Amino acid sequence: MDNNEISSHQPVLLREAIQALAIRRDGLYIDGTFGRGGHAQAILAALSSEGRLLGVDKDPAAIAAGHALAQKDGRFTIVQASIGDLARVVSERGWLKRINGVLFDLGVSSPQLESAERGFSFLRDGPLDMRMNPTVGQSAAEWLANAKEKEIAEVLRVYGEERYCRRIARAIIQARELNSLTRTKQLAEVVAKAIPRWERRMHPATRSFQAIRIFINHELEELRAALEQALAALAVKGRLAVISFHSLEDRIVKRFFREKARGEELPPDLPVMQKDFQQASLKVLGKPIWPVPEEIAHNPRARSARLRVAEKQTY
């Protein structure tokens, strides 16, 4: 792990995320998507010697960066786990209902995209992997080698909102009959040929790579689980801040915040009064926050980012 990688990575909506967390100097915080530690270092800077920060990530490279930070700052600990396993991580530390803030910065990180060996980018030729943790589960190449045409099309439609999902799926099946699809450039070329030229407002492989990555890593399922578990782990008045990068993620976060802010209606025949049945609820704090033009100019990856923030109201 290059120690410069932590400082060179540009965290998105950094100032806005730190403000949103309203950090208590002696508080307990979780960075649920540690990455290369950009947000984590800013949180630590706002904490006193009594404050604590737990970083969570399943990427081995992120864990290595986290260990480097932990050696320099005893207030920080890193754990290799998925955000969907947050409940276990919190319970093991006795932090349940004590956490003052949780931050999720969703999606793939810049270092992951920039590393050809990770297989996330259609702009760099590398193994067709796409796993956040390359030691767990099947790679994109392994899945594409065995998936049926209908399944591939459905993944592209649901997770990539790709209108040409059937054409692309058919092209993938035809291509793999000739040669195994094991490289990112191979897949990108197959997808590009399946999409009409007049539809190429962005790179033709963008949606397909997003869809396959989300599917391979179970990203949306883990996000739904993580939101519920984060709410349960927060102390009253604790903050939940989520940075998303595409509509699928943001839709889930928006719906979760709205449902928890509204509360759930109890069945009329339940033998308890509604007022006596406390449920964990959220107060949505303002509208989504977008990057300012200056940040987008400095870091183009930030252009699609949005930050939603909510505060826990009751146990």
Swiss-Prot record:
Which family does the record assign? Belongs to the methyltransferase superfamily. RsmH family.
Q: Does the keyword S-adenosyl-L-methionine apply?
A: yes
Whether NAD counts among this entry's keywords is no
Annotated GO molecular function terms are: rRNA (cytosine-N4-)-methyltransferase activity
Residues annotated as binding S-adenosyl-L-methionine are 37-39, 57, 105, 112
Q: What is its main location?
A: cytoplasm
Q: Which SUPFAM superfamilies match?
A: Putative methyltransferase TM0872, insert domain (SSF81799), S-adenosyl-L-methionine-dependent methyltransferases (SSF53335)
What EC numbers are recorded for this enzyme? 2.1.1.199
A cellular component term from Gene Ontology for this protein is: cytoplasm
One GO BP on record is: rRNA base methylation
The name on file for this protein is Ribosomal RNA small subunit methyltransferase H
Lineage, uppermost ranks: Bacteria, Pseudomonadati, Pseudomonadota, Gammaproteobacteria, Chromatiales
**EC main group:** transferase
Which gene specifies this protein's sequence?
rsmH
Can you state which reaction this protein catalyses? cytidine(1402) in 16S rRNA + S-adenosyl-L-methionine = N(4)-methylcytidine(1402) in 16S rRNA + S-adenosyl-L-homocysteine + H(+)
